[in-house]
Regions:
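Low-complexity, acidic Ser/Thr/Pro/Gly-rich terminal tails and inter-domain linkers that flank the onset
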Residues: 256-285, 302, 363-401
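Short acidic, flexible loop segments centered on an aromatic residue
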Residues: 288-305, 413-432, 471-473
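Substrate-binding clefts and catalytic carboxylate motifs of secreted carbohydrate-active enzymes
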Residues: 126-302, 309
Length: 483
């Protein structure tokens, strides 16, 4: 369900893993998710000794899953070669799906990046040391996100949380594979040095959000023939966490979402306005197989005092399954505050708001791929100067069948931006109720802006003393005991 919410529509069953259950494929059928199914060989293993047993497993698996409409593609291995006779067997048993020998052939290049990089490198297409990766189809492209502080506390002792115990954190990051105690920490510190794990984890969500947004939006920009390079898609590596780790993704092993889920969902909405940190341009993406004419995209820029210092609009005609690239350029005023904010609004020809987007940006110059500099990466210390804001919250609870819902309406009643707010549905012990499904989270509100969010969970997950919490960068936390 989180996958469906994120907007991701193709899942890779990696060759080092398994063939999923019938229930998994049934869910993919129902949710409209496609599956890239690899068989059980990887580049770091040998071919099986018992070929007959292997081919028997391929046959039984294909017979079991071939009638699922979600099954899109067969791949014989991950970064290896095929067992002789595999394509012939697949043609005999199915013959209706595409096939390739391994994950990095037939015009599909090898993957990366996997670790933390400067988010500016996604726009520049220098994130991989192997060369250009924002082109064609990429089978492995991704970045980490720190889990929420509640997950971190469940993962290790308080003494190892803060100050960060590098040995423990690296152990929980595959011997430091994703660079969480090095580059990720350095980038988090560009939001200001933290004095507690709570503060560090909050800033870690900001970096995770930028990681995801920069990846998906640069691929949006280069969709098909519309951008600087031809891009047909990517498989996010890796999609889920198979164990507790400090390098999370859109959600943690325990099904606790991170900011990356909601910023990915925003980036992959079917009609989407987006900003390019390298070009300072605004583009509009259309994933529908129909065109839309006379849409209006508006870009607003606010300084650190929430004063609007720039606003410009452009009328765009959106081609079917296409992109209106560089519809307008944002001209940041001379003397603008070191940290500032960008609000994008997309409206249809009748003036109805279709979507919106929000960014934080610094004046720091990008000095190249060997640095941790740039307007998406550094110079955010002045966020600590953001003045206090106020958000008025009202909610209603309802029940439908076995599920419990909290419908929340929020409005920024101040003249200051309410930055990076998080809703939480907690039990009496102030631990997150999991899984709970939020229609949005980790969001910002401009002065006067209104927002609605619905939280859903199973009734069986509820307990006495359930709490609704709203907290944020520059608002006082609010707590409500739900009945």
């Amino acid at each position: 369900r989180y996958t469906r919410q994120s907007g991701v529509n193709l899942l890779r069953m990696w060759g080092g893993g398994i063939a999923e259950s019938d229930y998994f494929f049934q869910l993919c059928d129902e949710l409209g998710l496609l599956v890239w199914q690899e068989f059980w060989m990887t580049g770091d293993t040998r071919h099986p000794h018992d070929k007959a047993l292997y081919m028997s497993n391929v046959e039984s698996t294909v017979k079991r899953i071939r009638n699922h409409p979600s099954l899109a593609y067969y791949v014989a291995s991950n970064e290896s070669t095929e067992m002789t006779g595999t394509p012939e067997l697949l043609n005999q048993l199915d013959g209706t799906r595409g096939y390739q020998m391994q994950s990095e052939c037939a015009g599909v290049h090898d993957g990366s990046p996997y670790k933390q990089v400067n988010p500016m490198q996604h726009y520049e297409n220098t994130a991989s040391p192997r060369g250009s990766r924002v082109d064609g189809f990429n089978p492995e492209y991704g970045a980490p996100t720190l889990p929420t502080v509640e997950i971190l506390r469940e993962m290790m002792d308080e003494k190892d949380l803060w100050p960060i115990n590098k040995e423990v954190w690296d152990y929980l990051d595959g011997n430091g594979f994703h660079l969480m105690t090095t580059m990720y920490t350095d980038l988090v510190n560009h939001y200001g040095k933290s004095s507690s794990i709570d503060e560090f984890a909050q800033k870690g969500q900001l970096l995770g959000a930028i990681n995801s947004k920069s990846i998906w939006e640069v691929w949006n920009y280069n969709k098909l023939d519309y951008g600087d390079r031809f891009c047909s898609g990517l498989l996010f590596w890796y999609h889920n966490c198979s164990m507790r780790q400090v390098a999370s993704r859109m959600w943690d092993w325990s099904l606790e979402p991170t900011a990356s889920l909601y910023h990915t969902a925003n980036s992959l909405e079917p009609l989407h306005a987006q900003f390019d940190y390298l070009k300072n341009t605004v583009s509009v993406v259309n994933d529908f197989y129909r065109s839309f004419d006379n849409y209006k995209v508006t870009a607003q820029v606010y300084d650190i005092n929430s004063r609007k210092v720039f606003e410009e609009s452009a009328v765009v005609n959106l081609p079917a399954d296409g992109v209106a690239n560089d519809a307008l350029t944002i001209r940041f005023p001379d003397g603008i505050s070191q940290v500032h904010f960008i609000k994008l609004i997309l409206k249809d020809k009748k003036g109805k708001e279709i979507s919106s987007n929000f960014y934080w940006r610094s004046n720091d110059k990008y000095e190249g791929k060997t640095t941790l500099t740039g307007p998406a990466a550094s110079g955010f210390e002045d966020l600590s100067k953001l003045r206090a804001s106020k958000v008025k919250l009202a909610y209603k609870v309802r029940e439908e069948g076995d599920n419990y819902f909290v419908d929340i309406t929020m409005r920024n009643t101040s003249n200051q931006i309410a930055f990076f707010n998080q809703l939480q549905f907690l039990n009496a012990k102030m631990s997150p109720i999991r899984p709970s499904f939020y229609t949005d989270n980790f969001f910002s509100l401009t002065p006067g802006e209104k927002k609605t969010v619905t939280i859903e969970t199973a009734k069986e997950k509820l307990s006495e003393g359930a709490m609704l919490v709203l907290k944020g960068w520059n608002i006082d936390s609010q707590k409500y005991k739900l009945k």
